[in-house]
Amino acid sequence: MKLILLVGGPRGGLDLFQSLLDNHDEILQFPGIIHINEKLIKILSHKSKEKIAQNFTKEYLSFFDSRKSIIERHYMLGDKKKQFYKVNTKDFIERFILLSKKNYLFKDKLFQNLFLLHMAYNSINNSKKKKLLVINAHSIPYALNFEKLFKGVNYEIIHTIRHPLSAVSSTLKNWLKFKNGVHLKPKELYYNLESIVLGIQKLNKLKKKVYIIQLENLHQKLNLVMLHLCKIYNLKFKKCLRKSTY
């Protein structure tokens, strides 16, 4: 099984791209961002498997009831934007404990726990053999954290970008929608502008394979982009790769 980190450039359509992967039965992922930080490591480090799963469900409430999502629009699904999803936390915890007794794929114990959390979440609905583990790391700092916190775990990166002028324009328009910079503070605005220019360069320093997907191509050449993805990772091309889940 190959591991992919999704890393988004400013206004680069990362959530859109991940939503296109949601229903593919060879892909394993949580429906949203995994914050690669010390808090996650603390959860994964617990000696009790039950505590790991319990603490994870508390930290990522929206994975188990999408109505609790604040940033992503997973509470506005379907044609009428009124649908949502729920996952039974009791079943998830029990499945994680069971999987922990017999599944060993990664040498890194902490990452093994993260992998099994993915398996427990997915196996409730779909138990087919997986070829690709996808983690939405969201931003470059979290990708850098991954390299520090999970040393020895091999991975590749998919980085979504947007035409620089469109990215700057969208960043500024999004910023101006909110009073007093509540949603996007000045330092975050600076980070976005810096990432437009230096983002790919920073990711290349990790010395991993980095694949670039431009948002404009997702809109205009979707079939070509997804066919190329399937060829690289030996996935079956399916219609679900052409339809966002939200």
Functional labels for PLM-detected ranges:
Residues 6:
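Hydrophobic anchor at the beta1->P-loop junction of P-loop NTPases
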